[in-house]
């Protein structure tokens, strides 16, 4: 999957493990947990888009994600948010852990370093505020799949069915 550096289809994600220390302790070696997280993320990236997954240090994993619009109805941004939700649910189901995902959309490939700094600063400053959620840096709101449920007066639900429709 080729990355088009001039498209509005490039996203940077910071996936923060909410209970990293506890999960690492459950594995015989700390590297095994990191490998399991990277494997889940890379599998989903490969299935629904393109990009790379890397673990810099501590409890945060990063993904540079490139998605193509699947149709004229679903924007690359909504598709990326749906992929984030797929990450969140897969980590919860497979590793019995929760994560918070910070998403930013640089305009061009050259903006990726600045986006990395912005997303890292946001994650470090607010990691104690967010738990098991997706934080959209562009509009600092919950994704539209959550917002619809809240607008209807209902409590937000785990939108896995909607996610599969989006992806």
Where does each model-flagged region fall?
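Hydrophobic, helix-rich cores of sensory/ligand-binding and other regulatory modules
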Residues: 1-167
């Amino acid at each position: 999957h080729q990355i088009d550096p001039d498209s509005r289809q490039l996203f940077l994600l910071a996936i923060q493990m909410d209970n990293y220390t506890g999960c690492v302790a459950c594995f015989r070696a700390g590297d095994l947990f990191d490998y399991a997280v990277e494997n889940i993320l890379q599998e989903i990236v490969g299935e629904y888009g393109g990009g790379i997954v890397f673990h810099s240090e501590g409890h945060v994993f990063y993904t540079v994600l490139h998605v193509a619009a699947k149709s004229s109805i679903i924007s690359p941004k909504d598709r990326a948010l749906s992929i984030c939700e797929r990450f969140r649910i897969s980590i919860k189901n497979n590793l019995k852990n929760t994560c918070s995902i910070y998403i930013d959309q640089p305009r061009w490939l050259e903006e990726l370093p600045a986006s990395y700094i912005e997303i890292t600063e946001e994650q470090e400053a607010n990691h104690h505020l967010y738990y098991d959620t997706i934080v959209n840096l562009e509009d600092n709101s919950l994704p539209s799949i959550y917002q619809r449920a809240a607008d209807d007066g209902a409590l937000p639900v785990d939108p896995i069915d909607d996610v599969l429709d989006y992806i």
